[in-house]
A protein has these predicted regions:
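Acidic/polar loop patches that form or flank catalytic/metal-binding clefts of enzymes
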Residues: 20-21, 49-59, 155-156, 172, ...
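Predominant activation on well-ordered alpha-helical scaffold segments within soluble catalytic domains
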Residues: 7, 37-44, 112-115, 144, ...
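Conserved thiamine diphosphate
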Residues: 1, 196-198, 216
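A cross-kingdom feature strongest in bacterial/archaeal respiratory oxidoreductases
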Residues: 46, 79-80, 88-202, 231-331
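Acidic catalytic cores of enzymes that act on phosphate-bearing nucleotides/polynucleotides
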Residues: 17-119
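Long, well-ordered, tryptophan-enriched scaffold segments
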Residues: 1-16
Length: 331
């Protein structure tokens, strides 16, 4: 792509009265994804396309509620509400609420760290929930070899995935429509959803499985429903405090931050160009150019490009058992 074309595109973007940058997984799922996302965010910051209506940046995820998983602390360096695991005040607050003497301030491992840490003997067990890493992760040969060396693999899912087929223990979970809860949209909006049908067979909601597991291990969790869990979350997370179950039912949609019960939420962040940093200014990142890791060479002379299938969703983990869809996109 000529440099002239890139500059022309940037000038068009900068001159637009309002502009939004959305990116898919092609931007993020390669060796320089972090640098690219920082660059796109920097473009928005330097052109005034943050902090007002109809502008911004954001990823288009491969699944619903990826934002929700991050909001709830399913990250190696964050507790719920984006509170750092290395912050002493955060550790003290959560430890007191959860009735334990202390909590670890150590940053955990990312998903791509897992096979390497298994090889190093630092991970001996893996508890996989709603994920199919033996079907979807990069360098599957390494991932499968690492999983074969685990002393224990637990999978909690709604289908018998490739990963579940290798598990030592399987916990069958309810699927969408069989339980209630809250989703987060990509624009930080909380959306409450209701159970539509009773689950069939010996399956349980994710939260109940976790509660039973914790209780069996000596840490009793006595939640009766998702509202009790949500209210505990609100008390511990200032960003979410005002997003009550009752208000979500009435408004249908509450974007965080929502810090008080009379607030409708925050439709856009950084109003007035005030950022959550010392001095209130945004931070621009500079990334040095480096050649992509995914270039062909003598050892790997071919590039495999995968595409989306019309008849299946994503990696077939959820749709591969449907015979009608298999006829549309069979190998």
């Amino acid at each position: 792509l000529p440099a002239k074309s890139i500059r022309e595109a940037m000038r068009i973007y900068a001159a637009a009265p309002s502009a939004t940058i959305l990116w898919g997984m092609g931007v993020t799922q390669w060796g320089q994804g972090v640098d690219v996302v920082k660059g796109l965010s920097g473009l928005a910051l330097s052109t005034g396309n943050l902090g007002r209506p109809n502008v911004g940046v954001g990823p288009v995820r491969g699944q619903n509620n990826v934002q929700g998983a991050c909001d709830m602390g399913a990250l190696p360096n964050m507790y719920p509400g984006y509170q750092s695991v290395t912050d002493p005040a955060t550790l003290e607050k959560f430890a007191k609420a959860w009735g334990v003497p202390s909590l670890s301030g150590k940053v955990g491992y990312s998903l791509t760290d897992v096979p390497h840490k298994v090889k190093e003997g630092k991970i001996k067990a893996n508890y996989v929930m709603g994920e199919d890493p033996l079907q979807t992760e990069p360098d599957l040969s390494m991932m499968r070899e690492a999983f074969s060396e685990l002393e224990l693999l637990i999978v909690q899912d709604i289908f018998m995935t490739k990963t579940a087929a290798e598990a030592d223990v399987i916990f069958p979970a309810t699927s969408w429509g069989e339980h209630e809860g809250v989703y987060s949209a990509a624009d930080r909006g909380f959306q409450r959803f209701e159970k539509a049908v009773e689950p069939q067979g010996d399956v349980k909601p994710d939260w109940e499985i976790i509660s039973l597991m914790a209780t069996a291990l000596g840490y009793p969790m006595k939640y009766n429903n998702t509202k009790e869990i949500w209210d505990e979350l609100r008390e511990l997370c200032p960003l979410y405090y005002g997003a009550t179950y009752e208000k979500m039912a009435g408004l249908g949609y509450i974007p965080w931050p929502c810090t008080t019960e009379d607030s409708p939420g925050t439709p856009w962040l950084y109003a007035g160009n005030k950022f959550d940093r010392p001095g209130g200014k945004g931070l621009l990142f500079a990334s040095e150019w480096r050649a992509p890791m995914e270039l062909v060479d003598e050892q790997y002379p071919l590039v495999l490009c995968t595409v989306r299938e019309v008849g299946h969703y994503s990696c077939r983990s959820m749709t591969g058992n449907c015979s009608a869809l298999q006829t549309l996109a069979d190998e």
